[in-house]
Amino acid sequence: MKRIGVLTSGGDSPGMNAAIRAVVRKAIFHDIEVYGIYHGYAGLISGHIEKLELGSVGDIIPRGGTKLYTARCLEFKDPEVRLKGIEQLKKHGIEGLVVIGGDGSYQGAKKLTEQGFPCVGVPGTIDNDIPGTDFTIGFDTALNTVIDAIDKIRDTATSHERTYVIEVMGRHAGDIALWAGLADGAETILIPEEEYDMDDVIARLKRGSERGKKHSIIVVAEGVGSAIDIGKHIEEATNFDTRVTVLGHVQRGGSPSAQDRVLASRLGARAVELLIAGKGGRCVGIQDNKLVDHDIIEALAQKHTIDKDMYQLSKELSI
């Protein structure tokens, strides 16, 4: 293999730049040229493709976001549109593609593979919801951002003796809510994978109040429902002074943590190794702190699951 491409797609996540850097440097180490595809699959279709050198990725490892920019591209679901993308890759002499992103990005890589172009997926999303890996690039940084925010909110919740409902990202996956809630001692954690009883939430808050607790933190993944509605329900049912904070896109930004930088470097380099070995149609991951790779079609057929033991622990510790 003489030339490969790399793109980032979908929602950005801290550590994507570290992965790009690893792809470029690993490939050049093996005398392979690397071309960056800007704005994800949209840039692939339009031909926004440029050669990357060692200097192209200098000093990007501590930066959040993605040097290659990113975008969502719904038209890439069309086979004819994907053929245009493949034509652009062949036009530039690119023989393999590294795709950094989440579930939608993997779907695009899978479709390209099925149409005969070798791709390797690298899991980049703060949601930590990609099958075949224990952790995704950006999750640890987002988690620390959320924990820092909750710490600050708890300070003011304590001062004003208030209940706070804090909404975090996670439309379909509750990892951020679960890990952050457990790490911060939240009184209640609501995630889309687990049904909840609002009466039970209310009863839990009242029990805390009866034993003298003056404030509470409830962490809600966005996929559960409206945090504002949950906050209103709590205030009406308890008469507790209740506030709602939606953390939003701050969770996607910031300099990546050491863990995300190292993870991204390992996964990006491994993706290049797979392409060199002629193993397209794969996705890389980390399991039990060891690098792994899976057939991307098989990986996408799996469903991300929450850590049931951790969820149970969070309930037991928040009595």
Curated annotation (Swiss-Prot):
ADP binds at R21, A22, V23, V24, R25, R154, G185, A186, E187, R211, K213, K214, H215. One of its GO terms (molecular function) is ATP binding. The active site is at D127. Gene3D superfamilies: 3.40.50.450, Phosphofructokinase domain. It catalyses: beta-D-fructose 6-phosphate + ATP = beta-D-fructose 1,6-bisphosphate + ADP + H(+). Its cofactor is Mg(2+). It comes from the Bacteria. Pathway: Carbohydrate degradation; glycolysis; D-glyceraldehyde 3-phosphate and glycerone phosphate from D-glucose: step 3/4. GO terms for biological process: canonical glycolysis; fructose 1,6-bisphosphate metabolic process; fructose 6-phosphate metabolic process. It holds the Pfam family PFK. Allosterically activated by ADP and other diphosphonucleosides, and allosterically inhibited by phosphoenolpyruvate. ATP binds at G11, R72, C73, G102, D103, G104, S105. Keywords: Allosteric enzyme, ATP-binding, Cytoplasm, Glycolysis, Kinase, Magnesium, Metal-binding, Nucleotide-binding, Transferase. One of its GO terms (cellular component) is 6-phosphofructokinase complex. Substrate binds at T125, I126, D127, R162, M169, G170, R171, E222, R243, H249, V250, Q251, R252. Mg(2+) binds at D103. Its EC number is 2.7.1.11. It is found in: Cytoplasm. HAMAP family: Phosphofructokinase_I_B1. Belongs to the phosphofructokinase type A (PFKA) family. ATP-dependent PFK group I subfamily. Prokaryotic clade 'B1' sub-subfamily. Catalyzes the phosphorylation of D-fructose 6-phosphate to fructose 1,6-bisphosphate by ATP, the first committing step of glycolysis. Homotetramer. This is ATP-dependent 6-phosphofructokinase. It comes from Bacillus cereus (strain ATCC 14579 / DSM 31 / CCUG 7414 / JCM 2152 / NBRC 15305 / NCIMB 9373 / NCTC 2599 / NRRL B-3711). The gene is pfkA.
